[in-house]
UniProtKB/Swiss-Prot annotation:
Reported phenotype of the disruption mutant: No visible phenotype, but lacks lutein and accumulates high levels of zeinoxanthin and beta-xanthophylls. Triple mutant cyp97c1, bch1 and bch2 is paler and smaller than wild-type.
Descriptive protein name: Carotene epsilon-monooxygenase, chloroplastic
Transit peptide: 1-36
Keyword Hydrolase (UniProt): no
Any single Gene Ontology cellular-component annotation: chloroplast
Cellular localisation: Plastid, Chloroplast
The gene coding this protein: CYP97C1
Source domain of life: Eukaryota
């Protein structure tokens, strides 16, 4: 997915802010969501534990410090400064950060500043400004995203810059060709989706509730392991140290993005702070596992004298991306290859799992849409598994997924850092080093951009038209980002979601467990705080 992976939405410098008059849009009415904000008064949940990060800094202390540091600061950008309230701090520090960003968009307009002591962020909720920033690489680099995820990605292309990024992207993109996707649909996407349905049978038989967010996360981890390096995590069936390490590393990246103080930049502290010691052990295990897979695959490629002989080369025994990259005989170190694969592992796993979670949630709340989706599956597939050529015929399911990604984009924000002074559309000035937070969530939910923006309406996208993307919507729809650093795996991710949802809906009915409060929190994607519990039954 888009390589701004780990909660670019929440930064290590989030804080409270002082207000200035604005000359932008007047406040708009708040949208009504079926999901409750994590800043609402909590109600009983199915689980008592919350995944929401807790800061050791109290909101009152943070407010006082920030206002003291920010007061009197010169600002010639022409960008208004948002004024946060204490209730917003919980979401700024480890919660659903995109919710207060959305609230302030309605108050201050499509661009505003969050001042955080010596550092501040420009929040962008306007498609034209987003287009300008995303298309103008290398004027705008990854910045904060690279800082919080380098411990895991190393020099992987997800966070690489300059010539290294150009070289690695050129090496990776050819591996995602049409023939590869057609093979993976049958051998991996369908098989893993069938395995998921199989694992849901006990729940269908006894009527007990199942956390579908967790199940989709497990399934997509299995998919990405097989697709990338022909490695079966088998996380739907078993637990293993490698699986635990993957989730530990993902959690650490999310926590780093919300830590007020980036203490993990100090090597000495990383050796004694328990959280950092655990994260380092996890990353070491993941890297050793991937390095071992690379070494074994390289040995096979060398022994067989394998070499790519056409643009859509696929090894029949092992169609993985790793096999393609090694057979290309490109001069690249095992460490660089490892970092590139880890970039794709994290991006491909986190995003698709969240897309499926929220799509199923939305369908469960809309019986008409759910019925249409199942009718399409029955008509197109006629009881069999989807093949590559069937995907283009699953038009309504595709639009349901598109609409889900509009309402719940992954990631909900993208971060860039200005490398040179620039003037944004609207004549707003930014200086070198300015961090810019593009709120995909705001753009996708803005009533200035979309009619009935808060409603789940798959039909808003022409079912017989082109699949919506940043180009044909003029950056109004950017779930995979846009510009030169757009997600390289957008087709892979969309096809995986279509196949998984089709297989699921073909075999099972689904019902949302009533009376559960589904709160949101920010990570690499939009998570629930306590899971998404549903009941499934055989069709």
């Amino acid at each position: 997915m888009e390589s701004s992976l780990f909660s670019p939405s929440s930064s290590s410098y989030s804080s409270l802010f002082t207000a200035k008059p604005t000359r932008l849009l007047s406040p708009k009415p708040k949208f009504t969501f079926s999901i409750r904000s994590s800043i609402e008064k909590p109600k009983p949940k199915l689980e008592t534990n919350s995944s929401k990060s807790q800061s050791w800094v109290s909101p009152d202390w943070l407010t006082t410090l920030t206002r003291t540091l920010s007061s009197g600061k010169n600002d010639e950008s022409g960008i208004p400064i948002a004024n946060a309230k204490l209730d917003d701090v919980a979401d700024l520090l480890g919660g659903a950060l995109f919710l207060p960003l959305y609230k302030w968009m309605n108050e201050y307009g499509p661009i505003y500043r969050l001042a955080a002591g010596p550092r501040n962020f420009v929040i962008v909720s306007d498609p034209a400004i987003a287009k300008h920033v995303l298309r103008n690489y290398p004027k705008y680099a990854k910045g904060l995203v690279a800082e919080v995820s380098e411990f895991l990605f190393g020099s992987g292309f997800a966070i690489a810059e300059g010539p290294l990024w150009t070289a690695r992207r050129r090496a990776v993109v050819p591996s995602l060709h049409r023939r590869y996707l057609s093979v993976i649909v049958e051998r991996v996407f369908c098989k893993c989706a069938e395995r998921l349905v199989e694992k849901l049978q006990p729940y269908a038989e006894d009527g007990s509730a199942v956390n579908m967010e967790a199940k989709f996360s497990q399934m997509t981890l299995d998919v990405i392991g097989l697709s990338l390096f022909n490695y079966n995590f088998d996380s739907l069936t078993t637990d293993s140290p490698v699986i635990e390490a993957v989730y530990t590393a993902l959690k650490e990246a999310e926590l780093r993005s919300t830590d007020l103080l980036p203490y993990w930049k100090i090597d000495a502290l990383c050796k004694i702070v328990p959280r950092q010691v655990k994260a380092e052990k996890a990353v070491t295990l993941i890297r050793e596992t991937v390095e071992d897979l690379i070494a074994k695959c390289k040995e096979i490629v060398e022994r067989e004298g394998e070499r790519i002989n056409d643009e859509e080369y696929v090894n029949d025994a092992d169609p993985s991306i790793l096999r393609f990259l090694l057979a290309s005989r490109e001069e690249v170190s095992s460490v660089q290859l490892r970092d590139d694969l880890l970039s794709m592992l994290v991006a491909g796993h986190e995003t698709t799992g969240s897309v499926l979670t929220w799509t199923l949630y939305l369908l469960s709340k809309n019986s008409s849409a759910l019925r249409k989706a199942q009718e399409e599956v029955d008509r197109v597939l006629e009881g069999r598994n989807p093949a590559f050529e069937d995907i283009k015929e699953l038009k309504y399911i595709t639009r349901c997924i598109n609409e889900s990604m509009r309402l719940y984009p992954h990631p909900p924000v993208l971060i860039r850092r200005a490398q040179v002074p620039d003037i944004l559309p609207g004549n707003y000035k930014v200086n070198t080093g300015q961090d810019i937070m593009i709120s995909v969530y705001n753009i996708h939910r803005s009533s200035e951009v979309w009619e009935k923006a808060e409603e789940f309406l798959p039909e808003r996208f022409d079912i017989d038209g082109a699949i919506p993307n940043e180009t044909n919507t003029d950056f109004k729809f950017i779930p995979f980002s846009g510009g030169p650093r757009k997600c390289v795996g957008d087709q892979f991710a969309l096809m995986e979601a279509i196949v998984a949802l089709a297989v699921f809906l073909q075999r099972l009915n689904v019902e949302l467990v009533p009376d559960q409060t589904i709160s949101m929190t920010t990570g690499a994607t939009i998570h629930t705080t306590n899971g998404l519990y549903m009941k499934v039954s055989q069709r």
